[in-house]
Amino acid sequence: PDELIEKFGADTLRLYEMFLGPLEQYKPWDTKGINGVHNFLRKFWRLVHDHENNFSVCESNPTKENYKTLHKTIKKVEEEIERYSFNTVVSTFMICINELTDQKCNNREIISDFTILLSSYAPHISEEICFEVRKNTGMQKPVHKIT
C-alpha cells in the first residue's frame, strides 16, 4: 500500500478500501477502481479551488436545491452507517459532489457541512478544506473537533 499512498494519498486508499464492498464480504485485492475514488477527491478539491488552485467559495445563501442535496446525503450516510455499508457511504459522497458540481455550488455553508460529514472517511483533505472554509470566521477548530 505504500506505493499507492505515495501515488494517490492516504485518503484515496482509505476510501477505496471502503468502496470495495461490504465489510463482511471477501474482496480480492485489486486496484483497478482506485482512480475513480481519486477522481472523486480531485473533483471535490476543484469544486472549492479556482483554476490557479486558490481556495474559492461563495458567500451567498445556498439554494433549496443545494440544501436538498446536502440533506439527502446526510440522511443516506446515517442510514448506511447503521448498516455498516461503508461502500454505499462512499458512493453517496460521490453522488453528492456530482450534484453540487452540476449545481455549481461551492457555497461556504454547504461545503463546510459536507466536509464535516466526509472527515471521518477522508480526514486529510477534509482538514485542509475545513481550515480554508473556516479561515477568518472565528471558527478555526480542526475538523475532528467539530464532528
Model regions and ranges:
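Helix-rich, typically C-terminal accessory recognition domains appended to large enzymatic cores
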Residues: E3-T147
